UniProtKB/Swiss-Prot annotation:
Domain of life of the source: Eukaryota
Record's subcellular location: Membrane
SUPFAM superfamilies: F-box domain (SSF81383), Galactose oxidase, central domain (SSF50965)
Tissues showing expression: Expressed in seedlings, roots, leaves, shoot apical meristem (SAM), developing panicles, and, at lower levels, in developing seeds.
Compositionally biased tracts (Pro residues): 1-11
Bilayer-spanning residue ranges: 72-92, 112-132
Cysteines engaged in disulfide bonds, as pairs: none
Function per UniProt: Component of SCF(ASK-cullin-F-box) E3 ubiquitin ligase complexes, which may mediate the ubiquitination and subsequent proteasomal degradation of target proteins. Together with FL/APO2, involved in the temporal regulation of meristem identity during both vegetative and reproductive developments in an APO2-dependent manner. Promotes spikelet formation by suppressing the precocious conversion of inflorescence meristems to spikelet meristems, probably via a positive regulation of class-C floral homeotic genes, but not of class-B genes, and through the control of cell proliferation in meristems.
UniProt Kelch repeat ranges: 229-277, 284-339, 350-397
Name the record gives this protein: Protein ABERRANT PANICLE ORGANIZATION 1
Lineage: Eukaryota, Viridiplantae, Streptophyta, Embryophyta, Tracheophyta
Keyword Transmembrane: yes
UniProt pathway annotation: Protein modification; protein ubiquitination
Organism (species): Oryza sativa subsp. indica (Rice)
One Pfam assignment: F-box
Gene of this entry: APO1
Length: 429
């Protein structure tokens, strides 16, 4: 577990134009410290990180368990998106709100001398990013908090695999990770046979977690490791191709089932995402995909469906189309995408679609869909230059994840037997 005391800033590429009134020191100097701490705990993470340099006491709040616990409960939800370029050494963070802006944040991964990155981005949840080891065999899954630079590894996965699909669902004191498909049946052959599930919970024994018995994937499954998984209501969802199908994993039952997607013969570059959720309510599974059909009555478009009632043992569920990209926006998007596909993620009410470039190294443009306002808009160009890395993991292209910057990710403490969970943001008192 690494926890350097030097925390990275979150510099914004755009400066706020709104001028706030200066704080009157005659008022703030006389406020009780508990009240000041309460106000600071209500600040968004980027705002507090910029303010921590104001005085030594504010900085030391970063290492106060009671303050981190309050900040975890009181700070507003931030629907950021993390663009991860393998071997680049940093994240590109997109704030998709009306005043969209970009930030850059270094990655806390250990350096690998004399070669490409040994870990590739795989999943994200609750302020944590997951990175999977590139080497074939028994996999190592690293969880990292880029804000605090905490880093911890899950126990080695029990089944040897080549390039599996990974899902992650983290809570304040729990972690569920799924590593599925690409079983190494021999040194030269892989099959999509099984999935391994890691479960850790502060209330269970042992709290440091364990790998549950392997579960069997549905027959004829074909998983794409770059597609990832969505999580909602205790179930993981991932895409299977040739033909397209949605695979559903019930964590409690340790059983997989299959749901048919809408218009499956005409989908291109489909992606499953978690729409909504956060502190406002339960997340819904949504399917975002380009639709291409030769008949003129069904024009080319990008559509978004939500699933209701899916995931039961019978594989039922109904899809409802909730959004369709307007023709003029689709024309711009299709020109930017050029048939190469796109990366997609959802966070709260926002969906981000990033066309893959010809070199597939870094995002050159990103389209934001605000589902609450039913509004499509382009994010400003990313001002940061990403140095291309050829070969190895760097050739895989960027990934985009729903990411919320958090000071406290207490669940990561479950993976370090020498560090109690309270040291990472939870406090009983």
């Amino acid at each position: 577990m690494m926890n350097p005391r030097r925390l990275p800033p979150l510099p914004s590429s755009t400066s706020s134009a709104s001028a706030a009134d200066d704080m009157d020191p005659r008022v703030w100097r006389r406020l009780p410290q508990p009240l000041v701490d309460r106000v600071l705990a209500c600040l968004p993470t980027p705002s507090f990180l910029r303010l921590r340099a104001a005085c030594r006491r504010f900085y030391h709040l970063l290492f106060s368990s009671p303050f981190l616990h309050s900040h975890l409960l009181l700070s507003p939800h931030l629907p950021f998106f993390a663009f991860v370029v393998p071997a680049a050494g940093h994240l590109l963070l997109l704030d998709p709100t009306a005043t969209a802006s970009w930030s850059r944040l270094p990655l806390p991964l250990p350096p690998v001398a004399g070669g490409p990155a040994a870990f590739s981005p795989a999943a994200a949840s609750a302020g944590l990013l997951a990175f999977l080891s590139d080497a074939s065999g028994h996999k190592t899954l690293l969880l990292a908090n880029p804000i605090t630079r905490l880093l911890a590894a899950l126990p080695i996965s029990p089944t040897p695999r080549l390039s599996p699909t990974v899902g992650l669902a983290a809570g304040p004191t729990s972690i569920i990770a799924v590593v599925a498909g690409d079983d190494l049946v021999s040194p030269f052959a892989v099959k999509n046979i099984s999935a391994d599930t890691f479960v850790a919970d502060a209330a269970s024994v042992p709290p440091s977690g364990f790998w549950a018995p392997s579960s069997l994937l549905p027959r004829l499954s074909s998983l794409d490791p770059g597609a990832g998984m969505a999580f909602a209501s205790g179930r993981f969802y991932c895409m299977s191709s040739s033909p397209f199908a949605v695979l559903v994993f019930d964590v409690a039952e340790n059983v997989w089932s299959k749901v048919q997607p809408p218009m499956r013969r005409f989908l291109r570059s489909p992606a499953l995402v978690e729409l909504g959720g956060g502190r406002e309510g339960a997340a819904r599974v949504a399917l975002v995909s380009a639709v291409e059909k030769s008949r003129l009555s069904v024009p080319r478009s990008v559509r978004l469906w939500t699933l209701r009632g899916g995931g039961g043992g019978g594989g039922g569920g109904a899809w409802t189309e909730v959004a369709r990209m307007p023709p003029e926006v689709h024309a711009q998007f299709a020109a930017a995408e050029g048939g190469r596909g796109f990366e997609c993620a959802a966070h709260g009410d926002y969906v981000v679609l990033a066309p893959r470039g010809p070199v597939a190294q870094a995002p050159t443009s990103a389209l934001v869909f605000d589902s609450r306002r039913d509004e499509w808009r382009w994010a400003p160009p990313c001002p940061y230059v990403v140095v291309a890395h050829h070969g190895g993991a760097g050739a895989a292209g960027f990934r985009v994840f729903a990411y919320e910057p958090r000071l406290a990710t207490p669940a990561i403490g479950l993976l370090d037997a020498t560090a109690p969970v309270a040291l990472h943001g939870m406090h009983d008192g």
